[in-house]
């Protein structure tokens, strides 16, 4: 009978199937988003509450931190690995694995945690909200993360333009010292840990981890060749882990609530909650914490009030900050906001800074402006980046006017491919990908613009 039913395509009801197979595991989650308030880690993103120590304590920061520290590095690393947390700065490397690289037998050199708060990517402003309105989350995260990797101090490298944020952070650090939460015998755990703030001077390239280390050491912010990696030779020649602000700030909550709790959000390999910036042509630009793998359309419509002029007025979206390729409206309809789904869509999650562009946007001019930014911020160390991005910038300026030949589109694509993957750091990639996204999805717009320019030029010549 069962064989006949199989031939007919008939399947057992779910409960009966479970009883026959003995499989009692819960069904896989298939819908994502609508994060509940009680599951939010960042509860003061908009600065409606007191950001100082008293307010932070009332919101659950520094709760049972001593117990977390006393459980030791292996336990903390275990929870972080269980959580499935991946780096929130753009690369998406598994955090537990990265932090565990520091747990080698000591050779006598001190270990350091460096927090990358040099948030200079156009469209990205999530970390500054944490530092400005929830600085104690970051300070506590430094302590917990430092304990996990056996570090003795944390250096928070903050963007030079973040004046108010640096001030708030310094106040939070002073309060933590005065309360005995950091410093000698931090939280009464017997563990000594210091936190220092280093202010940058406006160079976007210092967001790259080795350029950041060079800057802390007082040198020019130019990326280093790897290997050696920072976990072996980092700041002051000592083992160092460089981590993003959001990555560090969520670690105490993961340890308090458990890695399994955090892993319950989002798809497999894309777990947890995430801060998203939504800017551009939306009714209510915002920074919001939402579940990973939330549909992009739902994210924009629920939290940002939708696209100006309605969803049908959408032209394209840059989903992860200026260095990720844009995606057109047709892709935005169904794509999920996580690492794997966006890679499949030929883009990336990056910093999760969603830049929305409606049909009023000159898409060619918008991308050309981003290329000008990368040309300006290139440190000039690598020839493909120094020469290639400058060349792309000049070509894109002509593309904006339409003063080019269709064959130059393929030439521009080729030069972007010669830059991508051929530089010491990822700035070259960040300049190449927006161009590739434009050509991939808006080639007809480029060709039409060139055709219009040629017709106008011919008409002017005929008139003269």
Swiss-Prot record:
The modification N6-acetyllysine is found at residues 81, 104, 375. It catalyses: a ubiquinone + NADH + 5 H(+)(in) = a ubiquinol + NAD(+) + 4 H(+)(out). GO terms for molecular function: 4 iron, 4 sulfur cluster binding; FMN binding; metal ion binding; NAD binding; NADH dehydrogenase (ubiquinone) activity. Pfam families: Complex1_51K, NADH_4Fe-4S, SLBB_2. Residues 1-20 form a transit peptide. Its cofactor is FMN; [4Fe-4S] cluster. Keywords: 4Fe-4S, Acetylation, Electron transport, Flavoprotein, FMN, Iron, Iron-sulfur, Membrane, Metal-binding, Methylation, Mitochondrion, Mitochondrion inner membrane, NAD, Oxidoreductase, Respiratory chain, Transit peptide, Translocase, Transport, Ubiquinone. It is a peripheral membrane protein. This is NADH dehydrogenase [ubiquinone] flavoprotein 1, mitochondrial. It comes from Pongo pygmaeus (Bornean orangutan).
